[in-house]
Structure formats: C-alpha cells, structure tokens
Amino acid sequence: MSGPRSGSGSGGSTGRPGDAESRRSAYEKEAHELTTQVAFLEEEVAMLRRRLSESPRQVRVLEERLAEVQAELSSATGQNDRLVATLREARDQIVTLKEEVDRLAQPPSGYGIFVSRYDDGTVDVFTQGRKLRVTVSPSVDVGSLSPGQEVMLNEALNVVEARSFERQGEIVLLKEVLESGDRALVIGHTDEERVVMLAQPLLDGPIRAGDSLLIEPRSGYAFERVPKSEVEELVLEEVPDIGYEQIGGLKSQIESIRDSVELPFLYKDLYREHQLKPPKGVLLYGPPGCGKTLIAKAVANSLAKKVEAITGQGNGRAFFLNIKGPELLNKFVGETERQIRLVFQRAREKASEGMPVIVFFDEMDSIFRTRGSGVSSDVENTIVPQLLSEIDGVEQLENVIVIGASNREDMIDPAILRPGRLDVKIKVERPDAEAARDIFAKYVVPSLPLYPEDLAEFDGNREATVAAMIQRVVERMYAESEENRFLEVTYANGDKEVLYFKDFNSGAMIENIVARAKKMAVKAHIEGGLKGLRMQYLLAACLDEFKENEDLPNTTNPDDWARISGKKGERIVYIRTLVTGTKGTEAGRSIDTIANTGQYL
C-alpha cells in the first residue's frame, strides 16, 4: 500500500500542487476557527466563573433592594391609611358642620303649656298669651301629657316634645280649692284674687288653704306647693334631744309643767270624765340663763316618748314649733300678724294628724308687750290681739299648747297672762345651793379624767372625789363672805342692800364655770402637767367667772337691769360695786337714773 500511495503521491504532488495548498489553507482556517472558538469558550468560562463568584454579592444587593422596596411600600401604606383617616375625619366634620348650619338655620322653637286633648289627636296649648289647638308629632305620646305640662312647639306650632312642669313664676296664697277640684282661688302679693288651674302635681297631692303655690301668671296654672320660707325660718319642727334628766335644780318646775302639758294629752279620758279642761298655755318666767328654754325643749322630747309608748309605734313624735320672737317683727304693716297666723295654722295642721304640738315663744316680752307702752310705734296694738285670737282659737283643738318664756313678765300684756290663755305660770328662779349641786353634777361626772392627787385624797373613789369637788365649789360660790360681795343697791325709799354673787348665779353660769375648769385642765396637760380635772381649777374658774361679771351692772337704768336679772320689788336708784380686786375695794360709781318709763332706752 505504501508503494502505490508513494508513487501516486509523488506523482500527485508533482502533478497537483494547488490541492495541497488549498487543503492546508482549509486546515489553517479550520484551526483558526477552532482556536477562535476555544478562545471564546475560554472567555465564556472565565465570564461564567466571574459571574459565579459575583452572584452572592448580587443576591445580597437584591435582597437589600427588596427590603428597601418593602419598607417604602409599608410607609406608603401607612401614609395611605392616615390619609384615609384624615379624609374620613374631614368628611365627618363637614357633615357635622352642615348639620350645625342646618340647625342654626332652623326657625326658633317655642314653648307652651298643655291644656287638654281631643279624640282626633289634636291638643289645646297655651302659648304667647293665646290658646291654640295644634297637632302633635307622632314621636310624642299624647296620652302621657298632663294638664299644665310644658311642651315644645316647632315653627308650625306643632307639639314636637314633652317637657317637665314649669319651675319658676310667682308665689300666691291659696284661699280655697273650688268644687271642680282642678281650680283654686288664690291671693296675689297685692291681695288681688284670681282663679287658677291646678297642674297634675297639685292634683295628686293634698293642698290646704294658706299654702303657698307657684303659678305662671300668663297661663294661669299653679304647678307646685312651695314651703313657707318665712315660717320655716322661725319654726323648728324637730323635737330636741333633751331629757328631764339632763336638767338640774328644777325638779318642782319640771313637775309643774309635766302636769300642765303631759297629763292632759296622755289621760284625755280622765280629764273628760272629770270635766277638766286642759290649759291652753304655760308661761315660764325668771332670770336669764336659768333653764326656761331647756325645760320647754325637754317637754317636747318627753311628750314624744310618751306618745310612742302609748301608741306602740316606733314613729311616735311630738312637734315643737320654736318661734324666734324678735324675728317675727317686720317693718311692713301686717306682716308680723300674718306670720303669727301662719305659725298657728302650721300648728293646727300638725295637730290634725293626732300628734301633740307645742308652740314655744322665746323672749315673749319682745313682741307681746303691753298695749300702749310703745314709744316710737304702736305695733303691739295689733300683734297682741292677733295672738289672743289665735290662742282662743286653740280651744277647738285638743293637741296644741302654747309655752312662752320671758325674763320680763311684767312687760307682757296682761290680757295674754289672764286665766284661760296662759293659764299656768311657772317661775324659774335662780338656783340655790342645793340646786347648784344638782346642776354641777350634770357636768362634773365621775367618768371625767380626775387629777391624781385629788383622787388619791379619797383613796381612788371617783364618786367621792367628784362629790367633794362639787361641795367645795358650791360652798365657795354661796358663802356670804367679804370676797363674794358684789353690789350695794339703794332703793327709792332710801334702803340699802348688799347683793352677793350667789344672787346672780344661774345654770348657764355654772356650765360656763365647769367649761373654764376643763379648759384649764387641758392646757395644763398640754404644757406637761398631770392630766385630769382638779378642785383648784374649779375654784379658779369660779373666781374668773365672778370677775368677768364685775362691769355688767353698769347700765343707764339700774332698775331695768335689776328687773331683767330677777330682782323685783322697790325701784333701784343707785348701784355701787363691791368687788374686791388687787387694789382693794373699788369705790361705788354713781349711775345716772332716768325717769322710769317702763321701756328699754
């Protein structure tokens, strides 16, 4: 094979030189293409290797970009939500403002008073001085409307809302309820009479002649009963929580007033059987501070307890109308008399309930003075007859009694004091030594803190210690010694008399002495001393109380002062103080005495 191939080759090469060249060129071209492809592939491989090495960083970049885009998206979503909320709020505000504008643009609503209803659904109302028949909105229950009730009207004067009853207007006095039951005759502030309709609240409750009513004058309706403020200020209906056991030194006076007030009420049948009329009134008179008002309060409390025991009901009570005498006086003509009438009208109302009523006039001499004794006015000329007529009117009632208190009974009109009016007269005198011990025992009790030294003196016996304290201070107060001399009075006939502090003692003074001593004990303990009330404090308090009263007799009219203090009899024209001080006995001071007019000047 080599021989022929060589032969043919040598013959070909020598014979076809162009074919070899073309093949070589083809080979070179093919090799170049392959080299180019290899180079391209190598570049591709290198590029792929670079891309492969760079892919984690790109992934991180893409992840970071994705996170940024997500954050921007979340922020855009939040802004969108806020924008939506703002738009919604703005829309609501626009709606509200539109409603407000519409409301403000509406015509004003009116008010009227409902009068009556009809079967066709219409009603009568009183508005702007006119009585109109109008229709009612379906939202209003016509059946629930009451005569006199206030209603709201729209611009077409239709009822659109039911309201409450009127709460302002004028005050009038009820004279009588007319036969129809829904009308009343009233008296205005100018004493003019008119007929008004009664609103539902007054139809539902009892009203009596003399009640104060609130009316709306334009509609002519009365809406409610108004408490009598002018009487409420003068009257205390609550029964005071004071018992007889709290009053000292007045046993005989307490027994007298109990016989006069309690027995007629508690034993009505026996009184009726013996044809015995109960007293209409009681006068308690005597010096100031001796327990007149206290007795009157205790009577009401005791009577309430007795009523509860007899009736067996836990709500048994007695009414105590405490009239503040000077406050009854009024500068307007007829006002004082009117208030007296209202007081007794209140008493009759309470007595009609079957409970005892005590009408207590304190400082009775200030309003019921003897007629004709006035200097600048003659007001007593009408006040006294008004009281007399009211007391005589009490005769028809079983449960009302009048109690008066005064320290100038000589100034009260005699017509009030005669039998048949203030039948029983009880003098509440200044306490003597025995009564003073009883009063001291109400305030100085064994349960108080007692000074250890005083307590040790009686071997720790508290009762004995207290009794000794009381005995010692009473002896000091009532001793007719030089240091207890108070005044020397000269009477119009020339006689002279020495008065001691005991002659001006009272329950109020004893209470004040004990209070002083207790305050001394408190201060001594605060300053580091031993705790407890001691005899020394009581004696010192007694001396301080005496010294405070040194200048009290210095009045323009000594006779008037002496009468108020309980010293009755011959007229006093001169007073000389006898109180012994640090500089000895003071000289008597002359007191100008004016003509005895029987009046305070």
Curated annotation (Swiss-Prot):
GO CC annotation, single: proteasome complex
Domain of life: Bacteria
Compositionally biased residues, Gly residues: 1-15
Region spans: Docks into pockets in the proteasome alpha-ring: 600-601
Keywords for the protein's UniProt record, in alphabetical order: ATP-binding, Chaperone, Coiled coil, Nucleotide-binding, Proteasome
Known pathway: Protein degradation; proteasomal Pup-dependent pathway
SMART domains: AAA
Biased composition (Basic and acidic residues): 18-31
Residues covered by region (Disordered): 1-31
One biological process term in Gene Ontology: proteasomal protein catabolic process
Amino acids binding ATP: 289-294
Entry-linked SUPFAM superfamilies: P-loop containing nucleoside triphosphate hydrolases
Coiled-coil region list: 18-106
Any Pfam family matching the protein: AAA
Single GO molecular function: ATP binding
Family of this protein: Belongs to the AAA ATPase family.
Oligomer and partners: Homohexamer. Assembles into a hexameric ring structure that caps the 20S proteasome core. Strongly interacts with the prokaryotic ubiquitin-like protein Pup through a hydrophobic interface; the interacting region of ARC lies in its N-terminal coiled-coil domain. There is one Pup binding site per ARC hexamer ring. Upon ATP-binding, the C-terminus of ARC interacts with the alpha-rings of the proteasome core, possibly by binding to the intersubunit pockets.
Domain notes: Consists of three main regions, an N-terminal coiled-coil domain that binds to protein Pup and functions as a docking station, an interdomain involved in ARC hexamerization, and a C-terminal ATPase domain of the AAA type.
Function: ATPase which is responsible for recognizing, binding, unfolding and translocation of pupylated proteins into the bacterial 20S proteasome core particle. May be essential for opening the gate of the 20S proteasome via an interaction with its C-terminus, thereby allowing substrate entry and access to the site of proteolysis. Thus, the C-termini of the proteasomal ATPase may function like a 'key in a lock' to induce gate opening and therefore regulate proteolysis.
Stated name of the protein: Proteasome-associated ATPase
Gene it is expressed from: arc
